[in-house]
């Protein structure tokens, strides 16, 4: 006869959680899994289609809880994607929306003067060496439409306006008044929305307006 003397000590919730994690781990080894990098670190995830995205520019990513966060830059199949939604978690994995980054721009920091530790024999002053500013590529989602809150319906932005979604970063050049060029046209950043930033992760929305050339 089977011994049930310790049955009351079994934590059913823990057992279900353990089994669920094992099943998900097996899924990450299956044919639906993808080897990707998230912020430069290799991860194994599952990427699925989003039924409401007919052009395939939006998908879902499923991965281990620590790996999925808003603002993560995902690279796979020679494409760059951005995690744009707050992940949903069920204690086994996280699921979030990703959108393809159709373009990018560069931010270059100011040049710096570095003390070489040497002294000018004539002036007696320290000798400094100029180090060129660091150039940072920022992947982004450039949109001329916006979705209505709580729906997938898209409406056009006011003429000449664009929303540019980027991963969270801190940079001296990222400020209102910045001029960016997309598809041969210049845009000026009029507002910066940090409301989707949580701690060190998230997305920033740049609200930009097309610059009108001066008349001659």
Curated annotation (Swiss-Prot):
Q: What is the name of the gene encoding this protein? A: yomX
Protein name from the UniProt record: SPbeta prophage-derived uncharacterized protein YomX
Organism from which the protein derives: Bacillus subtilis (strain 168)
Q: What is the lineage of its organism?
A: Bacteria, Bacillati, Bacillota, Bacilli, Bacillales
